[in-house]
Amino acid sequence: NVDACITKLRIQVVDPSKVNKQALLQLGAKGVMNPSKQSVYAVFGTNADRIKNEIKDIFNGKSPLLTNVVLSSGPALAAAQPKKKHRKHLQVIAPVKGEVVSTKSVKDETFSKDLMGHGFAIIPESNEFVAPVSGEIVLVNNHAFGIRTENGVEILVHVGLDTVKLTNKGVFKSHVKLGQKVGVGTLVLTADLDKIKANKLDTITPVIVLNESLGKKKIIIKKFGQVNQKAKILTIK
């Protein structure tokens, strides 16, 4: 079986010994994990869902199986970015009220090992999640959203862990559309935290600056601990 969430390609296999992890890394995966004996997760970031669909098309005979693919030993090329408008500093606010903690405490290696990028995590205490920066909605899903700022920096907000399992179960509601321009503090998503907890899933919410969009900029986290929604948490400069 092949599935995907907003960050990972999720594959169920019969024989784990036949999985070529190096090939997955050469194809652009930032990391490969084995959460269970017959599960393989490959961190392809926001490309995971597209790759899942391409694999399923091959399985269903809609696309030919390529047998002469040459794997690169270098990193995958980042998607084309719009022309950047340079600013000295970019402030990232808390998308929700709660407790700001290090990504190292997130029980998902995608975030705890900074495979997609750097940032912070927040244990939410409210159901409403707002845009942490101004920009364009470049990714929107039940449990996550991405915003690209005018200088090309991309921020991913991922509400909860493994919450892709709650898709179409009345837990999440998006208030924006792909391509929409939003201001900082605009309501983007609501989540029923009680339902997430009732399903024995973690509500911790990583807020990540994607590596490919960061370039040579530096990240400074200004505040940990209890914060209000819209508090200034992170500076990019």
Q: Residue locations for each model-derived region?
A:
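Short hydrophobic beta/alpha edge segments that flank linear recognition/processing sites
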Residues: 101-108, 144-146, 154, 183-199, ...
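A generic local secondary-structure boundary/capping motif
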Residues: 89-90, 111, 193-197, 222-224
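Short, structured patches in soluble enzyme cores that scaffold and shape functional sites
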Residues: 124, 209-211, 237
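Structured cytosolic domains appended to multi-pass membrane proteins
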Residues: 1-187
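Generic hydrophobic, helix-prone segments enriched in Leu/Val/Ile
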Residues: 55, 217-219, 233
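Glycine-centered secondary-structure boundary/capping sites
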Residues: 28, 200-203, 213-214
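Short peripheral tails and domain-boundary helices/loops at the edges of structured domains
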Residues: 170-171, 205-229
